[in-house]
Amino acid sequence: ALGGGLEVALGCDYRVALDSARLGLPEVKLGLLPGAGGTQRLPRLVGAQKALEMVVGGNPVKAKEALSLGLVDEMVSGDLLDGALAYTRQLLADNAPLRKLRDLAVSDAQDGLFDQFEQSIARKQRGFKAPFSCIKAVRAAVELPFDKGVERERELFFELLVSPESAAQRHVFFAEREVAKVPGPVSYTHLRAHETSRY
C-alpha cells in the first residue's frame, strides 16, 4: 500500500498486509505531502521519528518492518482476503476494541526533534519545498489536536500542489512513465546518407 492506499488503511482500526507488501507514503517525490490525514495518523502509530523518516524520505518499508513498527497488525502469506477474514474473526472472538488513531498521542516527540530533522536534510533538499512542508505537517500531529492537524495538512498540501517545484516533479515523474510506453526500440539502420547540392 503506497500513497493513497496506505492513507486509507491508516483510517482503519486494524491493518493486515501480505508478507510481500511494501508500505509507504512517497508523495514527497512528486513535490507533495501525504493527504487524507496520513501525516496525522502515521506519527500516532509509529512515532514521530519514524513518521518523519517515512514521510520526508518517501521510501516504503517491507511488511516485516511494518509489523514490528505496529504499522500493520497482522502479516499473512497466500491469499490476503482469507488472511484478513481469519484475523477479523479472531478479533471478534477476542472482543478486541475499536482503535481510532486520531485518539492516540504521538510518542517519542522529544524537544528539538523537528529542528534537528530539518537541519539534517537542509543541504540535500535545498530548493525543494515538499520535504520541509512534510516536517511541518508531522509537527502539527504533535502540537495540534487531530482535526486542526488535518486542516494544517490540507493547507500545506494545497500550497505545494500549486507550486512550480511540485509541477516540475510531477511532470518528470509522468514523462518517465510515458517514455517506458514507447513501443520497441527505435532503429535507424534503414536510413542512408544522401548527398545534396546547395541550392
Each language-model region and where it sits:
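Long amphipathic alpha-helix in the N-terminal Rossmann-like dinucleotide-binding domain
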Residues: 89, 155-168
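Amphipathic alpha-helical segments at domain termini/boundaries
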Residues: 7-11, 54-156, 174-175, 180-188
